[in-house]
Design a protein with these regions (language model features):
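C-terminal accessory/tail domains of diverse enzymes
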Residues: 3-196
Length: 196
């Protein structure tokens, strides 16, 4: 959230197409505002040299399994959106104020957040966990095609047990010892499951 005070950060703007994106980035480069596209810090950005989409919105996962689950989730969402785009479907676009508000709510309250359900446009906020579960159900066929269905199920495991941040808060609240929190982070980070 602190980073959002900088230019070229936060939710990305909507572009008509890749040429529109390239023109904007080119203007920033030609004017000397940025050295290259890596100086754009949107929550989601293209990495043209690698041909990838970088999702830069969530905290680093301390558990390898969580990082893999988040990657599987992002891959399946991108695959779903690409297929919809290629089929000529309208891709939903939400006002930056609304997406920024949801970002704030989840940064502040984590998996306990209640957010605006932008896809259904419900009037009341809903638990973010419900939105995540629905999205997992929608993207599971895409994860299956990518060979990452099992990894995607890790998202549901995170919802069941809590995130790395939840675990860190639990440890700190139990003994008020930041060293124990650091130890937990180190232990979780060093433990590499055999299946990954």
């Amino acid at each position: 959230m602190v980073f959002s005070a900088f230019p070229r950060s936060g939710p990305p703007p909507r572009f008509r197409d890749y040429a529109d994106y390239a023109e904007v980035v080119g203007q920033l480069e030609r004017s000397g505002c940025i050295a290259d596209y890596t100086h754009i810090w949107w929550d989601i950005r293209l990495h043209p040299r690698l041909g990838t989409v970088e999702v830069r919105i969530c905290d680093a996962a301390t558990r390898v399994e969580d990082a893999v689950a988040i990657a599987a989730y992002c891959q399946a969402v991108v695959k779903q959106l690409c297929e919809r785009y290629e089929a000529g479907e309208e891709i939903p676009s939400y006002h930056r104020i609304l997406t920024s508000e949801n970002k704030w709510l989840t940064a502040r309250y984590g998996l306990e957040a209640s957010v605006m359900d932008l896809a259904t446009r419900r009037r009341n906020r809903v638990p973010v966990a419900r939105v995540i579960r629905r999205t997992v159900a929608e993207i599971t066929p895409h994860a299956r095609e990518l060979g990452s269905e099992r990894e995607l199920e890790g998202i549901l495991e995170i919802l069941a047990r809590g995130s790395s941040a939840d675990r860190q808060l639990q440890i700190y609240n139990s003994n008020r010892d930041i060293v124990e929190v650091a130890r937990e982070i180190a232990d979780a980070t060093e433990t590499l499951p055999v299946s990954v």
